[in-house]
Amino acid sequence: RRQRQMCIRDRDIYGVEHDVLKEDIQVIFTKSQFKMYKYYSSWEEYIAMYQNYGCTAGKCNEEESFLPDAKLNYQMLQTLTDISEDEIERLANRSVEKIQKVASDRETMLEVFGASSQYKNKNAFQECLSIYPELLSDPYTKEMLRQIKKNLVKEGKSAKLDLSAKYMFLIPDLYAFCQWLFLGDKDPCGLLKDGEVSSFLYRAYGKLDCLRSPHLYREHAVRNNVVNAETKKWFTPNAIYTSCHDLISKILQFDCDGDKSLVCADPLIIDIAERNMKDIVPLYYEMAKAGAVIVTPEEIFHGLRAAWTGGNIGVISNDITKIWNSDDVDIDAIKILCMENNFCIDYAKTLYKPTRPDHINAKLSQITGMKAPHFFIYAKGKTAHQVQKKNGSVVNRLDKIVPNK
């Protein structure tokens, strides 16, 4: 009853009262989702304009019924500098076993072809292999297997490792949102506490490592996984839900508008990440915001040109990789480059990038002038003279662990 009374008094951003139950409202947009609300006097005016000009809406992303396993990448592993040789070998174990079995074990062959039972949307060739596995002895199939094995070796040596991990949509604790919206609770408790996430898919695991690309600073968000009767009732199965009391969105730099996290349930990587994340706090700085302009062909052109000329984040992320894989990791330099990378990402929207002070530029130029790390031979197809000599960095150590044959 209390909820219904509060619903009656709820107002939209234009001050109009709504009863969510009586009006059978199925979808609620927040102010932040309605980017151009200032240009309309009411929701009804927006609807009229929408219909008058024949506007349509499209889905950019849709939750999949089946989430395939995913792999970590070198950015996520290179930041775990406090790691032993034994731990690296154990992390690489599944990938090494796959390489060793890919030419002899039928189940491994079917898996690398995408023809095993876990894959639902098979193409014609995969269906044939699934129905008649003897095709694995065909000369064409054997040649494909050789190429697959070659790629698996490259992936292993560049830290694309097989671990228990899946990409999931990031969703906030919407129960807390309902408490705020319908009950007027200015400090809602929600279903998740600080340091907690909820993933029904990984309900058998007590802790999860939540990751996101690009992973440039130390951004391993290890959280307790809470799955109970209430979360089962209110949360959908194939997503990762985060707490409204947590700074996880600042660590992973995500918005709740279709962003995904690579959620890893491997106990070993979680132990290593927890050790390396000790005393690490999120990087935070105020970002610029562009002024409003009338949308014209000229402004669209300026925006596109800015995106192409000022948004090259690949150079910066490669410079950060050089530092992580150097003999002396300069954390302060990485922090500065991470900031520059984020300004670069937003440049097409903001048309602003900070200017380096001379002393900072001198320091960074010296560091980033180095060659790429040795494992870029496998990760980026570099030649031996384009990379540094092999050192003892985390990813470079995989070179001797992952077999060539």
Language-model regions, residue ranges each:
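Conserved small-residue
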Residues: 1-5, 9-249, 269-271, 291-405
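Short active-site loop/helix that positions an aromatic residue
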Residues: 250-252, 263-279
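Duplex nucleic acid-engaging cores and interfaces of nucleic-acid transaction enzymes
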Residues: 260
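Short, conserved aromatic-histidine micro-motifs
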Residues: 275-296
